[in-house]
Amino acid sequence: MRVLGIETSCDETGIAIYDDQQGLLANQLYSQVKLHADYGGVVPELASRDHVRKTVPLIQAALKEAGLTAKDIDAVAYTAGPGLVGALLVGATVGRSLAFAWNVPAIPVHHMEGHLLAPMLEDNPPAFPFVALLVSGGHTQLISVTGIGQYELLGESIDDAAGEAFDKTAKLLGLDYPGGPMLSKMAAQGTEGRFVFPRPMTDRPGLDFSFSGLKTFAANTIRNNGDDEQTRADIARAFEDAVVDTLMIKCRRALEQTGFKRLVMAGGVSANRTLRAKLAEMMQKRGGEVFYARPEFCTDNGAMIAYAGMVRLQTGAKAELGVTVRPRWPLAELPAA
């Protein structure tokens, strides 16, 4: 079975083809970072228009990369939510139209389920059950995963997501959009311990997160300690350490609560090297395992959508006859396979 995956939930146009026997056959990605950089964030209307321009050419490029034609595609999977409504509608409309023209099923995919399943694309995929840390610009969640569609929300951010906090703090430090990766690069040059940021909500029970206060703490620290290059690097280091420690503490609690031995980390922030190293060290001490996707599959991409669509189709998902998107779509509402 070969599935064409279409991802257009935000500011990346991702197209991929996944074969259940041969694996990933094609992966095309276009990023709109330069388009939105002057605005300091994603402009929804510009994002939608750029998806219109790029989606079909990238599908053609993916078919060429795989050496396939439309007749070789058995299903089309597209991101139906959550995300920006205009951007989602582009991918959904193209996906549903192609499926109709090619007479194959059209499978709507939950964007965060795509992220959650992305580590399954690797050579050593995680087995169920596991705790999943979904950590990105729009989401920070801990999920108990016992099977496809068997998701229990354990905790989530009550305000800013971790990735959003990274980007906002990076802007305070004078870094360009998207600032998260640049902040991490700056943090690598910082002095450990010069500044100590709080670890939000770790002094009380529960698995929820709160990161908005770290941005305020960073703003006050910047204002009170000057703006030379080393000070900015030290502040970046303190901020990153606080976020990573907070995520690690909550992951440990989730593992203790569930009794699971496997931790899956997914989403754009899961590419953070410090976070990967800290969680790997923690899981080694606990006698467990941590799993994550390669960096290019941590951020938005078509490969995870193609794979998630294939899994859903194989487990009995019904093809969509209409074009429907859900900008807000709780993961827990997905049906169990």
Swiss-Prot record:
Cofactors, names only = Fe(2+)
Any single biological process term in GO: tRNA threonylcarbamoyladenosine modification
| Enzyme Commission number(s) of this protein | 2.3.1.234
Q: How is the cofactor bound?
A: Binds 1 Fe(2+) ion per subunit.
Q: Which residues are listed for Fe cation binding in this entry? A: 111, 115, 300
SUPFAM superfamilies, from UniProt?
Answer: Actin-like ATPase domain
Q: Name one GO cellular component term.
A: cytoplasm
Q: Is Cytoplasm among this UniProt entry's keywords?
A: yes
Q: Which residues cross the membrane?
A: none
Q: What is its main location?
A: cytoplasm
Q: Where does the record say this protein resides?
A: Cytoplasm
Q: Which family does it belong to?
A: Belongs to the KAE1 / TsaD family.
Q: What is this protein called?
A: tRNA N6-adenosine threonylcarbamoyltransferase
What species is given as this protein's source? Answer: Klebsiella pneumoniae (strain 342)
